[in-house]
């Protein structure tokens, strides 16, 4: 009976450790995805902030040529 008890505790312990590792990896993956989304948004904001100056430069170039 003691052997079964020890085996059961061992199985439960290993299952708990495995579950903990999986949750940690999932959390890290979610953090990386969130960081990537934030980087994409900041790049988009930078591009949109440059857009008016690019348009005004193109308009002035067209006026000089036309």
Swiss-Prot record:
Positions of region (Disordered): 25-44
Official protein name in the record: Phylloseptin-H8
InterPro entries, alphabetized: Frog_antimicrobial_propeptide, FSAP
Positions annotated as propeptide: 23-44
Subcellular location(s) of the protein: Secreted
Record keywords: Amidation, Amphibian defense peptide, Antimicrobial, Cleavage on pair of basic residues, Secreted, Signal
Name of the coding gene: psn-10
Residues with Leucine amide modification: 65
Signal peptide stretch: 1-22
Pfam families: FSAP_sig_propep
Organism lineage string: Eukaryota, Metazoa, Chordata, Craniata, Vertebrata
Superkingdom of the source species: Eukaryota
Biological processes, Gene Ontology terms: defense response
Residue ranges with Acidic residues bias: 30-41
Recorded family membership: Belongs to the frog skin active peptide (FSAP) family. Phylloseptin subfamily.
Tissues expressed in: Expressed by the skin glands.
Major localisation: secreted
GO cellular component: extracellular region
Function (record text): Has antimicrobial activity.
